[in-house]
Structure formats: structure tokens, C-alpha cells
Amino acid sequence: MGSVVRDPALIRALVAVWRLPVVDLRVRRADADAWSGAYFGPARRGRLAQAVLELPAAEEHYLAGRPRQALRTNLRHARDLGVTSGRASTYEAWFEAASVILRARPDGHAVGREMDKPGPRQHVAYYVARDAHEAPLAFASVALFGQFAVLFTMLSHLDRHPRASWARYQLHTFLALDLGRSGARHLLAGSALRETAGNQYFQHLLGYRARNLRFEVAESGAP
């Protein structure tokens, strides 16, 4: 504690984090219990300085304005190359596509071991971006908690850049709109401070902002 007191820069950083806007999130007890052992579960998730995206319901609103210019450019590149994104109908179909990408990544084996089929009370949405020949370029998975969701997997094919990079932007835009149109209001993507510079830039272009989170667990039968 003494070293913190003697470091004015650290004190300013801590104060800035403490003063971030707070997002209140309500989660059902059944969902909180179903994900209690997961690193991103509401009961275990860090509350301070989290990357949060306010989910859009309309594409034209989400992509409007100068802050989204770079995102619009990346989406145009993906579209010109015939990249398409969609929601997988089953875990098995998604994992088959994801495995193609994982085999081309040095971290693929380790990541694949963490991508088990969800439990019966765990609600997950799966997404895949493909090139014009239907080859997988990027994949993502999102845990669903009603009015919010948690992005816990998103990777692209390392051997097919830059198209795989553009596909990642398209895939995220697709899933954000899909979730927003389904009634979810916020998408959480982990710490806003611990990500790599590349991921922080990716999140910035997509509209994520650092926010503090406050969870309320709603017991069964609560309105």
C-alpha cells in the first residue's frame, strides 16, 4: 500500500478507473449458477474497467458517423472479397468450422481443449465467417444472459490475412446486430486494460468502452 501512496501516476489511474460509468446488469439465478465455474461467469467476473459494447439494433445507426469510418472500410473490404457471416445452427457445425481455423494456429490445440459443448443450462450462440468458397475465416462464441451477453471466444485464421482480419470485423458486426435485435443490450468482452494493443484497437473501432459493472442476481420468481 505504501508504494501505491508514493506513486501519483498510479493513484490517478486508480481514481480514473473508479470514476468510470457504471453499467447495471441483472442476471437470473439459474444463469448465474449455470456459469458459476466459468472464468467469465457473473459471480467471478471482474467488476472494474471492463470492455462493454452497447449493442445496436439497427445497422445504419451502428455504422453511422466518423468514429465508425475505419470499421465501414474493413466491412467493405470483407464484402468485396465475398466474405459472409452467420450464426451456426448447432455446436457441432460450429466446432467443425472452428477446428479448421484452430489447426492453423499455434495456440489452436490449447484453445480447442477449452471449447467443450455447453451444459444443458448454459445458453450459447455460435458464429462463423467464411470466404467466397465457404472456407472458415473466423469464429466466435457468446454466452447469453438475457439482457447482456459475454464474448468468450473470437479467433481468425492466421494464414489467410488480411481477409481473415476483415472477416473478424464483419463477424463481430454481424453478431452484435444479431444480439441487439434479439433484445440484448450489452456485450462484455473482458478487461479493457489487460488486452493486447491489437485487441484494444479492435475493440475501439467496434465501439467498446471501459465501464465498471454492477451485477444483480435475480432469484427465481422475481419480476
What are these language model-derived features?
Residues 55, 89, 212-214:
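Residues at the C-termini of beta-strands that transition into short coil/loop
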Residues 93, 194, 218:
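Positions that flank functional sites
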